[in-house]
């Protein structure tokens, strides 16, 4: 009887051990892989003079590494808090340029980093260059692509703040840009999973009845408000194509930066407190200011 019981026990033990083995992701068969992993048609940027067509290439699917990145959902945003860029950002892996006047095949843009994650493309006013960002393990870098020489170079390190959208604005002289950067005064984010609440979250409607739209990923408490502030604060610096930089505007929660047609004025918008717990960041109180190209406020 004991001997008969031994075999089922051994079988069950071996089954449990095999089921606990760590299994890695598997690559499908070649036929299936070729069917799924088809190169997408490139995204196109074309200048107004019909001289250059910039072709942006990306993978059909995000990598497991990209999907496993940290994500913070706050104020209607989904942000990678360690890199200050949207966690759902579409990244491009290659850039080619087609000369519409004399080329039938696109030319490779030279000088791009190895395994790049490119985004935030902005063409210069004279349409001869494109500014773009490259996201690395350290953060977001600024790169410039010259459409005449078909070469790219990095001009600013891993400190760009892309939390509230594209951080790049060209100035009209085609030699300078305004970029949003992470301030040195930033504070560590609050980890909600490691703290005990000290009180309830309270909202008031002053006794009024009103319809209210619902949104995802809103600010829910003071800790969320603190984290949103730290992620959104940025300085605006002026930088040349040679990488020379100087401070333009001090730290605020800048949403947008735009330049007047003659290039003499810069208008910025920035978010102000108090934050709403009912709507996303783009419906928060916003102030607009106009500055001279020198950084002096226009009164």
List PLM regions with ranges.
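Beta-propeller folds
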Residues: 7, 19-299
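Sec-dependent signal peptide recognition
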Residues: 2-9
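Generic N-terminal leader/processing signal
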Residues: 1-2, 20
């Amino acid at each position: 009887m004991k001997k008969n019981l031994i075999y089922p026990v051994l079988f069950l033990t071996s089954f449990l051990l095999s089921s606990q083995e760590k299994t890695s992701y598997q690559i499908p068969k070649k036929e299936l892989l070729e069917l799924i992993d088809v190169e997408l048609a490139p995204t196109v940027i074309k200048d107004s003079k019909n001289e250059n067509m910039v072709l942006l290439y990306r993978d059909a699917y995000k990598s497991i590494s990209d999907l496993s990145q940290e994500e913070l959902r706050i104020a209607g945003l989904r942000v990678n808090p360690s890199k200050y860029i949207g966690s759902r950002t579409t990244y491009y892996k290659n850039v080619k340029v087609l000369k519409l006047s004399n080329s039938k095949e696109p030319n490779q843009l030279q000088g791009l980093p190895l395994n790049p994650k490119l985004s935030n493309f902005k063409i210069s006013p004279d349409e001869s260059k494109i500014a773009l960002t490259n996201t690395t393990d350290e953060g977001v870098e600024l790169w410039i692509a010259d459409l005449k020489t078909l070469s790219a170079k990095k001009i600013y390190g891993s400190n760009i703040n892309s939390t509230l959208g594209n951080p790049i604005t060209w100035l009209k002289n085609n030699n300078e840009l305004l970029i949003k950067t992470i301030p040195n005064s930033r504070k560590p984010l609050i980890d909600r999973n490691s703290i005990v609440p000290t009180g309830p979250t309270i909202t008031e409607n002053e006794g009024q009845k009103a319809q209210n739209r619902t949104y995802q990923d809103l600010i829910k408490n003071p800790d969320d408000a603190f984290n949103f502030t730290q992620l959104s604060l940025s300085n605006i610096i002026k930088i040349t194509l040679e990488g020379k930089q100087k401070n333009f505007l001090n730290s605020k929660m800048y949403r947008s930066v735009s330049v007047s047609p003659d290039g003499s004025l810069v208008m910025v918008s920035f978010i102000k407190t108090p934050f709403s717990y009912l709507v996303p960041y783009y419906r928060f109180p916003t102030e607009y200011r106009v500055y001279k190209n020198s950084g002096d406020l226009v009164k």
